Regions:
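ER/Golgi luminal nucleotide-sugar-dependent glycosyltransferases, focusing on the catalytic module
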Residues: 1-581
Length: 581
């Protein structure tokens, strides 16, 4: 069979997702010619890869004018309307779906052998007060008898470049089916939804509102928008997909994390590291940066580093000459190679790492750690925190690098939440809101390309204590800020500082650089009832009033508030009591 595929691609960030490449690879054998029509700009490397891998035969780049229908029209023009009759079928498809979840070959054979079918698709939409019955346009296939008809040519040559997507829906998507039905042609779909039960659905759009039905009827494609629209059940859909299909779920996770925020709950459920081992000799360049403020903890880390089964360079920073000498003595006694750099007592562990920009930029992977203690809280805060971070990010370093190497889209690995922050109610939305302005400032300073207002987020997925593994490119924009001691408050460090902002920004910086993240699971398993008890408090249902004394008088304003606030409260109480009398 001579089949033509006209495949439309669009990505608002002007890159091509892995799920598109996978899709083309899997469906390519079905078609004798594939025309790839991109409504967004492609790099030369991407175009070369598409051609060299024989994923497509032709590449057509165009402005995103007229959306998919105008793109398909232009694809037909590129092939030649008079040449379409040389094909047994023409299939129209776009990249708005993940798949194929199952092999398409049997579906093609079924419809090609069905004499009662002139054109077909995956799913349809029943007639309602707004639209006529129609095949949903993410997948349409026309047989030769339709291709050679005047109806086909008149419809597609008449497609206009609408700038409003609703005009495209009203004039083309919902009418392409009725146009051919009125001409006497017949259609079928893989999943005929016309008489299906729609209980609980906002609209009878099964491709969007009912992913369970899509899987049950073995539709080989699931729409991207369906994933985001059904967050509450998506973890179960993912489980079912793993059970019934061989489709790589990482393709869904990576794409959804790139086109929207990477920290939605349904995505977090799938971001734990996989059980993966380093294969053979690991050839990438690895740097380990350890900031040593407490020299008495150095050997604890050196012992932990013995778990590494890869070659690495150790960079140690500290604040004063005396400590530098003590560190070098310990290293000498242990015959441990390392470069020790004195960076001063500003910026805690973060600025010392950033000051090594020139050195660390030469490495593929960087692990960042520090001798964590907590002077502001109980001994066990810092003690438990440090030990658990070592268990999550130092001990399993082989597994971490194996995961990051296996998935090129993963650029950073953080630790799971340390138990101290589950037993103790510290990181809560009202406190986090106070840090978001500083995060927004840094985001703007870095020239981030993705739009996000951190004030709109309740909490953040962060690397507690800034322990982290990363690909240098993932955090390059942070290093390129070239922060200095002048940017960092002096000790004692105030709350909501630039360092607290950086701690919370790391995975989002990587996201802006088109990298996803993974989480190393805490081996200390706690019942989620602890979180339920700590976080679900009735007081949180009441509005909170915050007073920022930095904006209303500083210390004098705070003292005035102590006097005036209670006085006004007492006055209010007396007034209410008098009214009751």
């Amino acid at each position: 069979m001579q089949r033509l595929l006209l495949y439309v691609h669009f990505n608002k960030f002007n890159f091509i997702s892995g799920h598109v490449l996978y899709q083309l690879e899997k469906i390519r054998p079905l078609y004798s010619r594939v025309v790839f029509i991109s409504n967004s700009q492609l790099s030369e490397d991407v175009k070369d890869n598409l051609s060299s891998q024989n994923l497509v035969d032709d590449i057509l780049e165009r402005q995103n004018i007229g959306f998919d229908f105008a793109a398909w029209r232009d694809g037909m023009k590129a092939v030649g309307f008079d040449q379409l009759a040389n094909f047994d079928s023409v299939t129209l498809m776009n990249d708005t779906c993940f798949g194929p979840l199952w092999d398409l070959k049997l579906i093609y054979q079924q419809f090609e052998n069905d004499g009662e079918v002139d054109f077909w698709g995956m799913t349809n939409y029943r007639k309602d007060k707004d639209f006529n019955e129609h095949i949903q346009s993410y997948y349409l296939s026309f047989k030769k008898q339709v291709l050679t008809s005047s109806t086909f040519h008149e419809f597609w040559q008449g497609v206009q470049d609408f700038t409003n997507v609703q005009d495209v829906i009203d004039n083309y998507e919902t009418k392409v089916t009725t146009n051919f039905l009125d001409a006497g042609f017949r259609y079928k779909t893989v999943f005929d939804t016309i008489h299906e039960d729609t209980t609980g659905m906002l609209y009878p759009d099964f491709s969007y509102y009912n992913p369970t039905a899509i899987l049950n009827h073995k539709i080989p494609f699931i729409k991207v928008k369906t994933i985001a629209n059904n967050e509450g059940i998506m973890p179960y859909i993912f489980d079912e997909l793993e059970r019934v299909s061989n489709y790589p779920l990482d393709l869904i996770l990576n794409h959804m994390s790139m086109i929207d925020r990477p920290d939605y709950p349904y995505l977090l459920s799938r971001k734990y590291l996989k059980n993966q081992e380093l294969a053979g000799e690991f050839g990438k360049k690895v740097a380990v940066h350890l900031h040593v403020f407490y020299v008495d903890l150095l050997e604890e880390f050196l012992d932990a580093f013995k778990a590494f089964h890869f070659v690495y360079d150790l960079w140690i920073t500290t604040d004063v000459e005396e400590k530098k000498q003590d560190i070098e003595k310990i290293l000498s006694n242990r015959a441990q190679d390392a470069t020790v750099v004195m960076t001063g007592n500003i910026g805690r562990d973060v600025l010392p790492m950033l000051l090594l920009k020139e050195q660390l930029s030469e490495y593929d992977y960087v692990g960042h750690f520090h001798t964590k203690k907590s002077k502001e809280a109980d001994f066990w805060a810092g003690e438990s925190w440090r030990k658990e971070l070592i268990e999550m990010l130092v001990n399993p370093a082989d597994q971490i690098l194996a995961n990051m190497e296996a998935n090129p889209k993963v650029g950073i690995t953080i630790a799971d939440i340390p138990t101290f922050f589950r037993y103790n109610r510290i990181v809560v939305a009202w406190n986090e809101a106070l840090i978001s302005p500083e995060m927004n400032k840094l985001w703007e300073r870095m020239g981030a390309t993705k739009s996000i207002d951190f004030k709109n987020l309740n909490t953040f997925v962060m690397s507690y204590g800034t322990f982290v593994w990363f690909k240098y490119d993932a955090l390059k924009s942070l290093f390129d800020l070239n922060l200095t001691a002048a940017d960092i408050p002096a000790e004692p460090l105030p709350q909501n500082s630039i360092l607290h902002a950086i701690e919370r920004l790391l995975i989002y910086i990587a996201w802006d650089q088109k990298y996803d993240f993974r989480i190393s699971q805490n081996p200390h398993v706690l019942t989620p009832f602890i979180d339920n008890k700590q976080l679900n408090n009735r007081e949180d249902l009441q509005p909170h009033t915050f007073v920022d004394f930095n904006q209303i008088g500083g210390i004098k304003g705070a003292l005035k508030y102590i006097v005036i606030g209670p006085a006004r409260a007492v006055k209010y109480i007396f007034k209410r009591l008098l009214i009751r009398k």
